[in-house]
Regions:
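Short, well-ordered loop/turn sites that connect or cap secondary structure elements
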Residues: 51-52, 292-293, 419
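Short, solvent-exposed secondary-structure boundary/capping segments
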Residues: 80-95, 179, 319-338, 374-379, ...
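Extended, domain-scale alpha-helical bundle/helix-rich regions
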Residues: 114-132, 138, 146-344
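Surface-exposed cap/loop segments at beta↔alpha junctions
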Residues: 49-133, 137, 142-146, 171, ...
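Short, Lys/Arg- and Gly-enriched loop/turn segments at beta-strand edges
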Residues: 65-73, 306-314, 322, 432-442
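Structural signature for extended repeat/solenoid scaffolds and their inter-repeat hinge/linker regions
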Residues: 170, 181-182, 358-583, 588-591, ...
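Short alpha-helix capping/helix-loop boundary micro-motifs
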Residues: 38-47, 278-289, 408-414
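Polar/acidic, low-complexity leader/linker segments enriched in S/T/G and N/D
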Residues: 1-20, 205-207, 359-365
Length: 613
């Protein structure tokens, strides 16, 4: 990069093909915000403005040889302001951090089983951030599932850091700037030799403006959440303020949800929210001409009450160097206005970056490991991939379990339907939270057609599919047909069917009843009680085409028609009737150790030949 040789208040280094002279800079820096440096420059030659974009540049503010403050960034804007005379041209250049490109990028994607630091590294790398530093004073927890949905990568990264209690700032050198992420005041930068005093004067260590307003803050922060793995867990956490303001009980703040199912994290979220409220009312406003101040930088402030370390929360630098153009000896000036807070006050960003609200329904595809058609856990959850998640490598192994709504749910009772692999499901989000999806049902599509075609639109019901690799002819089914005059309830078991009744069963048939057993046996076992079959009108027919009929009783069997009976019991067989006729077409044989034939009124024997004895 070319650097002008001018030893003055402002100097600039850039990739411009013609030397640039910086004449004015207004630089804005704030913790957890992108810096923006507006720089007016003059070029002696022609500048290709398009070639300047996304190129590095640095402005140095030289404070009388005592210190130099660098403002490094990439060019996000470069345009002509005015033409001076016939040669020099004035341009406006804007420098921003490399992270600013994340404000342009937007995405819809899921991150599984990663810490916030892991996710941020991906975001920073995607945005072309070359230098980062994480100064974290606690180990980040692994996040099971984190969604970025229709939001810029900067928006996503900012809200992620706010949820973790983190914040960021930038450190500048002559040839680079570093994005620093931290979660503790110890992570801020100590400005070398920066000790400022309140008072009136022209030296760089004087603060010429100072204001410390007293403001009311929340008296208590309460957060609450719910853990479906442990429904009785107490996730209501409270944090009282340490500020000695009156009426704190009148200013409670409640937040739902806490965005965590972890007790320790819920405590942290309550504390971080309280610290953010306290930090916001601890700010002082100041101004002066110490050019070494930087957002996220520590300096000592000396007052009548003593010396205390403060940290710059935001600052606006204004510098102008027009001595050469104005033709005067000293046409330079520098000043700043800043906000700062005591180092004894933990800094915390408010959770102000809105989470995307997942309104309406979303659709997803059910995932399962290779060879599995039903993939679930002990809570009936499934793995899914949203259609807006463009990852081609999404599998059941790198996805998170998602709960499934059932028509009824209790402790081992209710309904249970587990969506199967490759089917499409509708997904809603608890509290519209992108990290809390829940499957609410299945959807037919161009590949997965409804059970019944349009011609059978009067039918409704359930049809399953046999697992594994069951075809269209392998299913269980329970359906209804509501076509007028042809109403039907249909039950199909692909293999076996078992019915259990703990007490009574009543079956009423108003017309015909047909039972067909194509092959196999039929068995009815009555362990205790009576069996009765009553036909009030009609006939009973029992037919065995190729076999035999056996009836067995421990006590007796009785056949009865009117007054005529045939009784078989343990003593023998008794035939009683108004008339008993035995007709043997070929032979009739009566045989026993004792045979008695008796006619009370008359005994008649007849035959072509009668042989006795």
């Amino acid at each position: 990069m070319a650097e002008n040789d001018k030893k003055s208040l402002l100097s600039i280094t850039s990739t411009a093909e013609s030397p640039l002279t910086a004449v004015r800079i207004v630089a804005e820096e704030t913790i957890s915000q992108l810096f923006r440096f507006n720089i007016d420059v003059v070029a002696a030659g022609k500048i290709n403005t398009t070639n300047m974009l996304n190129k590095p540049a640095c402005v140095a503010v030289n404070h009388g040889g005592k210190s130099t403050r660098y403002f490094h960034g990439i060019v996000s804007e470069f345009g002509l302001l005015e033409q001076s005379g016939t040669i020099d041209k004035a341009y406006r250049m804007v420098l921003v951090p490399q992270l600013a490109q994340a404000a342009i990028r937007s995405d819809c994607r899921m991150f599984f089983n990663k810490t916030a630091q892991d996710i941020l590294k991906i975001i920073f790398d995607d945005a072309g951030v070359t230098k980062t530093a994480f100064r974290l004073y606690s180990q980040p927890a692994q996040r099971k599932a984190t969604a970025q949905f229709n939001e810029t990568s900067l928006h996503f990264a900012t809200r992620l850091m706010e949820e973790e209690g983190w914040y960021y700032f930038f450190e500048h050198t002559s040839d680079s700037h570093t994005l620093v992420v931290t979660n503790d005041n110890n992570g801020f930068y100590t400005i070398p030799g920066a000790t400022l005093r309140l008072g009136v004067g022209t030296t760089a260590d004087m603060i010429t403006e100072y204001r410390k307003p007293e403001l009311l803050a929340a008296g208590k922060v309460t957060v609450k959440d719910y853990d479906f793995d442990a429904p009785d867990k107490n996730l209501k956490m409270e944090q009282n303020t340490i500020l000695k303001h009156g009426g704190t009980s009148n200013r409670p703040v409640f937040h739902w949800p806490a965005l965590t199912r972890d007790t320790d994290m819920a405590k942290n979220r309550a504390r971080w929210r309280m610290e953010a409220a306290e930090a916001a009312v601890s700010l002082i406003a100041g101004g002066g001409d110490n050019g070494g101040l930087v957002a996220g930088g520590k300096f000592k402030l000396r007052t009548d009450a003593g010396e205390q370390v403060h940290i710059v929360q935001s600052i606006t630098h204004s510098a102008e160097d027009v001595s050469e153009r104005a033709g005067v000896v000293d046409g330079t000036n520098y000043s700043n206005r800043f906000m700062a807070f005591p180092n004894t006050t933990p800094w915390r960003q408010p959770m102000a970056t809105a989470r995307p609200r997942m309104e309406g329904l979303h659709t997803a595809k059910v995932l399962a490991p290779s060879g599995e058609e039903i993939h679930t856990d002990d809570q009936g959850r499934i793995k899914i991939r949203f259609f807006w998640d463009w990852r081609e490598d999404a599998t059941a192994d790198n996805s998170e379990w998602v709960r499934v709504v059932q028509p009824w749910a209790g402790n081992q009772w209710g309904g249970q339907f587990i969506p199967r692999v490759d089917t499409e499901v509708a997904v809603a989000f608890m509290d519209a939270d992108p990290d809390r999806p829940v499957v609410i049902g299945g959807l037919y599509n161009g590949n997965d057609k409804p059970i019944f075609p349009v011609a059978e639109k009067t039918k409704l019901g359930f049809r399953t599919r046999s697992v594994t690799k069951g075809g269209t002819d392998a299913f269980n089914e329970f359906t209804f047909d509501d076509k007028k005059g042809n109403e039907l309830l249909f039950l199909h078991a692909q293999k076996d069917m078992r019915t259990e009744v703990e007490n009574d069963q009543t079956l009423t048939v108003e017309n015909d009843r047909t039972v067909t057993i194509n092959k196999g046996d039929e068995s009815v076992t009555l362990k205790q009680g009576d069996q009765s079959t009553e036909l009030k009108l009609g006939n009973i027919s029992v037919k065995c085409d190729l076999g035999s009929i056996t009836m067995e009783a421990m006590q007796s069997i009785t056949l009865k028609v009117g007054l005529n009976t045939i009784k078989i019991d343990q003593t023998g067989i008794t035939v009683t009737g108004l008339m008993i006729k035995i007709d043997g077409q070929v032979l009739t044989e009566v045989k026993g150790l004792m045979t008695q034939v008796q006619g009370t009124a008359m005994l008649q024997l007849g035959g072509g030949i009668i042989s006795i004895g």
